[in-house]
Amino acid sequence: MKVYYSLWPLFFMVILPLWMASCYQAPEFPVVPKIDFESVNFKQGATGFDTLIVRVRFQDGDGDLGLGGEENDPPYHSLNFLPSPDGDPCRFSERFDEGCRDVLPPEFNCVDYQYFTTLGQDTIRDTLYVELNPNQNNFMVDIMTKKNGQFEVFNMRELLCVNPLYGRFPPLKDNFSVDGPLEGVIEFKPPSSAYMALFRNDTLKLRIQIKDRALHDSNVIESCEFTLNELLEVGGCPQRP
């Protein structure tokens, strides 16, 4: 199975506690990261791009948190390609050929197919069947909308053919060969011109998860309920009991 790499934009800030730069006794945490919701805010921009500001607290026992934008080798690559019988990626025009037809969906969609002009050093200009690698990002936010009293995930990729609010926060220490606990706050600020157009009148929640370098998934948390106008009026949505 071949892999492909791409870089994702970064809109992160990380706040670490004072004990990390002092003589205080370091705490002990599990090696699987744990997160807690802190707040969500919304800022309207003068240039047409608004910003959703998500803050979570984290703890991790061995401190293997963060991915650099240049870390694109497996297991952090972005895409997998299912090969045709000759070993090359299956192309849309070959989807019914022997060897491809059993793995390719019959209809075009923007989740399973992507158009490429180049692949590595090769010029291809073709549509290829791809599988998204769930390990390419380490901070995942899903927007959920309330319908008939129940929250459901708004699937940006399937409905709009755009990437969801997933990204990478940078490495939180210089040397990952030395284990040590980490805790702090991660702030994710993805900009978009579509927030108000899509969700102006909706009641929303956020579903959030992070992943460490060993591919341990944290617990999944949810934000408080909010509307974008409420965030503008009250200045944010903290966690409520």
Predicted regions and their residues:
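Non-catalytic macromolecular-recognition regions in eukaryotic signaling proteins
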Residues: 24-241
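C-terminal motif of bacterial Sec signal peptides marking the signal peptidase cleavage site
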Residues: 18-22
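Hydrophobic helical h-region of N-terminal Sec-dependent signal peptides
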Residues: 12-17
